[in-house]
Amino acid sequence: MTDSQTLLADYVNHGSESAFREVVVRHLDLVYSVSVRLVGGDTHLAEDVAQTVFMDLARMAKSLSREVRVGGWLHRHTCFVAAKTMRGERRRQNREGQEDLE
């Protein structure tokens, strides 16, 4: 079985969609479960977070260090994206609450 770093390198070097798909399959449960926990159980927001995380991985894969542990990077990036998403949600809810008062 090939490790995630090798699969990601195959995606970067050869554009292998199947390699990237395998990385997603291997780590989707981790990313989604962390997302659900951090967005307070909102499964729709968690799906948005997970999608953003994997899109970011695809976009940033070339710039990631060869020594980076994909699972660790995904966990940390999921925490970052979930926090950013929740800040945006709070701002949106505050705006909507203020509009209701007017």
Residue locations for each model-derived region?
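Arg/Lys-rich amphipathic alpha helix in sigma70-family domain 2
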Residues: 59-67, 76-97
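Short, charged helix-capping/linker segments at alpha-helix termini
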Residues: 12-22, 32-52, 63-68
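Generic alpha-helical segment signature
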Residues: 1-4, 24-25, 46, 75, ...
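N-terminal module of bacterial RNA polymerase sigma factors
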Residues: 1-30, 97-101
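Structural recognition of an alpha-helix C-terminal capping motif at a helix-to-coil junction
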Residues: 48-55, 68-80
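Hydrophobic side chains within well-formed alpha-helices
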Residues: 7, 19-20, 49, 70, ...
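Amphipathic alpha-helical segments in well-ordered regions
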Residues: 26-30, 34, 73, 77, ...
